[in-house]
């Protein structure tokens, strides 16, 4: 869905010290609307950016009423409109009628709407109208009901921006993790693990650490796939066949990569500062440790895109949606990181 907003030059945005940041609502039936409302109550957010919610006005008003915060919604006619704490500036980005949708229940209309929110925000970022986009969680069943074949945000964003190489990083205060395979079954993750995939994710991680996180000489830890990193081939040969050759290729590129590391020990070492990032071989191998250590502090960051995109480190939380108890902390951290990266 295209917006009717007039063209805006990047120079017009850069004259304002606080960057314009698009925040997508995510699944309208999940906790996205309420955590956005809570985040926009915080003075610290308004001090670092000019937020724009890309979503649905009636849904946002419903979330504000639920929370009882008394915030005012401001339907935007121009991205340059002034706004202030206590307001929720919103760009209506769907024609779906969501007024009778229910919290915590998958709805095909919400599935379609969450896709429209993403597309509008991507267009704004690609056109230079916003400096970054921050995404609230989407529902993957809703994606399927909307006829979208992508398994998650990361893959959809890569498609919409034309990125050929991309990766998902979870970044916290103590730990940064990049899974080589992401949204697929464990069986498929093992079958699809490749030397090229590890090498590619290693390059993206190294580049992000240098350019975005200002780490001059980053050191990467590369996990093994099997228990004890295969223990010399006793528990599988993927380490010798796939992982070790990928590490050698990274080293030839001048990247300080170490491994294959024993998975049950490497995350503690990285959290203590020995490594600046860990390459995990599959989704849960990497995300369980960082969520255990830094839940609500970690931020999902997509590497390899021509735009800046950050996100929360959690899902739609249908079990608590509509109860007003969801924490906005991960979203706040995602907004802060997006602002920091937008100014580099």
Give the role of each language-model region:
Residues 2-153, 192, 196-281, 285-310, ...:
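Contiguous, glycine/small-aliphatic-enriched amphipathic segments in soluble metabolic enzymes
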Residues 145-167:
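Glycine/threonine-rich beta-strand-loop-alpha-helix active-site module
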Residues 79, 157-158, 166-169, 211-212:
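A generic local secondary-structure boundary/capping motif
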Residues 170-199:
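Ligand-binding beta-strand-loop-alpha-helix segment within the catalytic cores
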Residues 160-175, 305-318:
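Short, flexible loop segments at boundaries between secondary-structure elements
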């Amino acid at each position: 869905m295209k917006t009717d907003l007039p063209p805006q030059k990047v120079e017009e945005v850069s004259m304002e010290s606080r960057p314009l940041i698009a925040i997508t609502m995510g699944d309208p039936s999940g906790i996205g609307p309420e955590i956005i409302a809570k985040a926009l109550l915080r003075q610290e957010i308004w001090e670092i950016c000019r937020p724009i919610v890309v979503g649905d006005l009636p849904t946002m008003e419903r979330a504000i009423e639920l929370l009882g915060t008394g915030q005012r919604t401001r339907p935007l006619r121009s991205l340059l409109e002034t706004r202030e704490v206590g307001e929720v500036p919103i760009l209506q980005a769907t024609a779906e009628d969501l007024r009778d949708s229910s919290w915590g229940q998958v709805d095909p209309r919400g599935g379609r709407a969450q896709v429209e929110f993403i597309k509008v925000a991507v267009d704004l970022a690609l056109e230079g109208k916003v400096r970054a986009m921050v995404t609230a969680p989407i529902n993957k069943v809703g994606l399927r009901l909307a006829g979208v074949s992508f398994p998650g945000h990361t893959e959809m964003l890569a498609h919409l921006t034309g990125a050929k190489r991309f990766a998902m990083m979870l970044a916290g205060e103590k730990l940064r993790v990049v899974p080589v395979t992401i949204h697929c079954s464990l069986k498929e993750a093992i079958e699809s693990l490749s030397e090229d995939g590890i090498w590619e994710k290693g390059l993206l991680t190294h580049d992000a650490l240098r350019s975005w996180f200002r780490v001059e000489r980053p050191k990467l830890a590369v996990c093994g796939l099997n228990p004890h990193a295969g223990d010399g081939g006793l528990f599988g040969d993927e380490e010798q066949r796939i992982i070790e050759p990928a590490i050698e290729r990274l080293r030839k590129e001048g990247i300080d990569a170490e491994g294959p590391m024993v998975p049950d020990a490497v995350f503690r070492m990285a959290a203590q500062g020995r490594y600046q990032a860990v390459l995990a071989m599959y989704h849960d191998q990497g995300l369980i440790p960082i969520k255990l250590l830094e839940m609500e502090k970690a931020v999902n960051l997509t590497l390899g895109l021509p735009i800046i995109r950050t996100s929360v480190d959690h899902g739609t939380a249908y079990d608590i949606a509509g109860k007003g108890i969801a924490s906005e902390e991960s979203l706040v951290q995602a907004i802060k990181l997006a602002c920091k990266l937008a100014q580099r």
